């Protein structure tokens, strides 16, 4: 059995702002000190976007996604995680559907069956873009497939549960974001036949994760969490956390900061110190919406991309940013799924969302972009597969 190393980072930072990274009695305590603050800048989408391509996914019966939860791209292929509403042998079927660059369906990964090379549950998954493999965590094993759907291996991994996000590092190791019921841990784990935990880096009891003035005194420990790898730098956000952390060469430090601040009891504002977006939400009327947390982060040669309920692009060299809006007045339409491929941002918009976008444009007397209008002219409906929008980002400085 192939052995490879897994680094398990399970960190939720303190909400106080007194020290950047400190070690005390075996604890690593993280705060927001020394995070950078940049001035607000006004940019249009056309300032950052070179071109937009629309990719229609095949709508055959075997290609239908039913519902889509996560997407990634590599080698001209789109990998989309679908959890159909159909049930086979009493088990809800979960699949990763693979499409090529033109939107043509290629094959499924994760088909229900009784053979040793098939499985029924996909807890988390990621791409190893160096080895061109799909790695799937099913709750007790990590199962590896080739991009063509060929089974490679299955490794027992029970100590990982629960995993909220996982990714492959440039050196071939893995990193998973995880917590336990009573505490948060950061551990080095060697995935050999004995699956040994070789070292514990940090232990942080939940009692330390309090934010003064927040409802109930503690942030809700829910939400997806996210990890991003760029060259040798790893960015990660614990579930429903307000700080993006950088992990490099064994060191952890705050990188970007999005703060959930209480301005008065039960009235919260979600504010980025980067001034990329601002919005208010009254908990008394609406309740806290987990979708407002950071759901994805990406880093490319030129950009940092933050995804909550909107898409915020930050040009690193110019230190200028832009919000992608989500209404008919927006210059471009974002989607619920997003991934990056070199210097392009790929968003998936489900069929119903695109139909509603068309209706809102009609209400406002606005013409649809020609590429979207062409979809409806060809018979597009709310029962079709999602549509992919590839935004090719400019690389120049401003």
Regions found by a protein language model. Give the residues of each.
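Asp-box/WD-like beta-propeller blade repeats and closely related beta-sheet repeat scaffolds
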Residues: 120-122, 137-185, 200-213
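Short coil/turn segments at the loop-to-beta-strand junctions that recur within blades
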Residues: 61, 110-118, 157-163, 204-209, ...
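Short beta-strand elements that form the blades of beta-propeller/WD-repeat-like
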Residues: 76-89, 132-138, 172-181, 228-245, ...
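Beta-strand-rich domains and repeat architectures in extracellular enzymes and scaffolds
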Residues: 53-92
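Blade-loop segments of beta-propeller domains
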Residues: 58-63, 67, 95-99, 104-131
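Conserved blade-ending motifs and adjacent loop-strand segments that build the rim/top face
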Residues: 256-273, 280, 287-288, 318-342, ...
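Blade/loop signatures of beta-propeller domains
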Residues: 21-58
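Repeated scaffold domains used in trafficking and secretory/extracellular systems
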Residues: 67-70, 120-125, 160-168, 292-295, ...
């Amino acid at each position: 059995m192939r052995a490879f190393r897994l680094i398990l980072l399970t960190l939720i930072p303190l909400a106080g702002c007194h020290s950047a990274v400190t070690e005390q009695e075996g604890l690593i305590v993280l705060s927001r000190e020394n995070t950078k603050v940049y001035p607000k800048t006004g940019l249009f989408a056309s300032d950052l976007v070179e071109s937009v391509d629309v990719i229609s996914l095949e709508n055959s019966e075997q290609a239908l996604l039913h519902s889509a939860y996560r997407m990634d791209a590599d080698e001209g292929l789109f990998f989309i995680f679908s959890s159909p509403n159909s049930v086979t042998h009493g088990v809800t079927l979960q699949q990763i559907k693979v499409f090529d660059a033109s939107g043509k369906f290629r094959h499924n990964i994760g088909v229900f069956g009784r053979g040793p090379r098939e499985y029924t549950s996909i807890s988390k998954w990621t791409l190893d873009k160096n080895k061109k493999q799909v790695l799937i965590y099913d709750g007790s094993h990590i199962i590896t497939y080739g991009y063509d759907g060929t089974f490679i291996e299955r490794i027992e991994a029970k100590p990982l549960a629960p995993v909220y996000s996982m990714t492959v590092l440039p050196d071939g190791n893995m990193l998973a974001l995880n917590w336990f019921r009573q505490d948060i841990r950061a551990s080095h784990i060697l995935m050999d036949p004995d699956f040994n935990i070789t070292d514990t880096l940090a232990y942080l009891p939940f009692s330390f994760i309090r934010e003064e003035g927040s409802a109930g005194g503690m942030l809700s420990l829910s939400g997806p969490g996210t990890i991003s790898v760029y060259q040798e730098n790893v960015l990660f956000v614990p579930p429903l956390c307000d700080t993006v952390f950088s992990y490099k060469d064994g060191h952890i430090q705050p990188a970007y900061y999005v703060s959930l601040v209480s301005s008065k009891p039960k009235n919260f504002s979600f504010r980025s110190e980067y001034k990329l977006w601002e919005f208010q939400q009254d908990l008394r009327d609406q309740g806290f919406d987990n979708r407002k947390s950071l759901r994805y982060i990406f880093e490319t040669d030129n950009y940092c991309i933050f995804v909550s309920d909107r898409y915020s692009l930050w040009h690193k060299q110019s230190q200028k940013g832009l919000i992608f809006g989500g209404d008919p007045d927006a210059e471009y339409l974002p989607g619920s799924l997003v991934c990056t491929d070199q210097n392009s941002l790929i968003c998936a918009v489900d069929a119903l969302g695109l139909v509603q976008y068309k209706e809102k444009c009609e209400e406002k007397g606005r013409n649809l972009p020609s590429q979207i209008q062409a979809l409806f002219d060809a018979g597009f409906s709310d029962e079709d597969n999602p549509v992919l929008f590839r935004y090719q980002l400019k690389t120049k400085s401003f």
